């Protein structure tokens, strides 16, 4: 987060606090911090293995919630097949994250009953991120507060570290340092671009495209840590693509241009 904060500072700098809507300053920005904090605590409190995967899956409700909030609170017009598209795309996420073992509702309920806090924290993280995105559209006025968000996140995680909450430090290595540097830069730039997109772009298209996040993560993992992509991954990719295209068409913009071109 220190790397990300530095990166974001050099990209967008500090916002003009006099121009920031007070609602965005006191509610929007803290909501983004709450999302980061609750997601990290959700992963920390999970028991690992299948439960960590399921917690991540719950958190991936945020693209769907972002679109839902855009329809409810930001006046975005859509069509009925947006909702089947959301279900198909989220189903693809489940298939990708579950892997060859598949997803069992019974086992999911059992693990939730054992450790509901972790799952609820992941849900809060998803809701708050969607809320931050909606508030950015409504109150952001084109101002990008990513530097402030990351600076506060860094302080929060420093406090957690001082309280001995989190993973134990590992020995430094060239590979680890590269992961920290490139990971921090990637996360920082993602925040900057996402906030800009929420301010001025097509919310539903951006949120639908976000379903490709775990897809790209898996592809990157094959190069960075040598992970293997199984058949369930590609099946999930197909579902994500189909669902995202349905969401795109439901906005009433993308497919109109496509039909005119053809």
Sequence positions of predicted segments:
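Hydrophobic/aromatic residues within transmembrane alpha-helices
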Residues: 42, 72-78, 139, 145, ...
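C-terminal-most transmembrane helix of multi-pass membrane proteins
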Residues: 1-2, 176, 211-262
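Hydrophobic alpha-helical transmembrane segments of multi-pass integral membrane proteins
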Residues: 1-11, 26, 85-91, 117-124, ...
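Glycine-/small-residue-enriched transmembrane alpha-helix faces in small-molecule transporters
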Residues: 38, 86-87, 91, 100, ...
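Specific alpha-helical transmembrane segments that line the substrate/conduction pathway
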Residues: 40-75, 203-223
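Specific transmembrane alpha-helical segments of multi-pass solute transporters/efflux pumps
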Residues: 13-53, 95, 183-201
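Juxtamembrane helix-entry segments on the extracytoplasmic side of multipass membrane proteins
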Residues: 17-22, 98-125, 163-181, 228-238
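Loop-to-transmembrane alpha-helix entry segments
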Residues: 56-59, 75-95, 116-118, 174, ...
């Amino acid at each position: 987060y220190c790397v990300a904060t530095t990166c974001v500072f050099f990209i967008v700098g500090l916002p003009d606090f006099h121009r920031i809507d007070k609602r965005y300053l006191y509610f929007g920005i803290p909501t983004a911090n709450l999302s980061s904090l609750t997601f990290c605590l959700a992963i920390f409190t999970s028991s690992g293995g299948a439960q960590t995967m399921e917690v991540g899956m719950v958190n991936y409700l945020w693209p769907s919630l972002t679109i839902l909030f855009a329809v409810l609170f930001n006046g975005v017009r859509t069509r009925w097949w947006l909702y089947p598209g959301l279900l198909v795309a989220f189903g693809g996420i489940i298939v990708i994250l579950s892997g060859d073992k598949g997803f069992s509702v019974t086992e999911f309920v059992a693990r939730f009953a054992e450790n509901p806090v972790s799952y609820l924290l992941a849900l809060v993280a998803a809701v708050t991120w969607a809320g931050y995105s909606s508030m950015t559209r409504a109150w952001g006025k084109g101002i990008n507060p990513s530097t402030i968000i990351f600076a506060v996140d860094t302080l929060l995680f420093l406090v957690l570290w001082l309280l001995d909450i989190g993973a134990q430090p590992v020995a430094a290595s060239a590979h680890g340092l590269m992961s920290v540097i490139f990971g921090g830069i990637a996360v920082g730039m993602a925040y900057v671009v996402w906030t800009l997109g929420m301010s001025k772009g097509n919310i539903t298209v951006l949120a639908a495209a976000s379903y490709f996040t775990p897809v790209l993560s898996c592809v990157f993992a094959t190069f960075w840590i040598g992970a293997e992509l199984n058949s369930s991954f590609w099946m999930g990719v197909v579902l994500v693509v189909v669902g995202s295209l349905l969401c795109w068409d439901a906005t009433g913009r993308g497919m109109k241009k496509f039909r005119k071109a053809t």
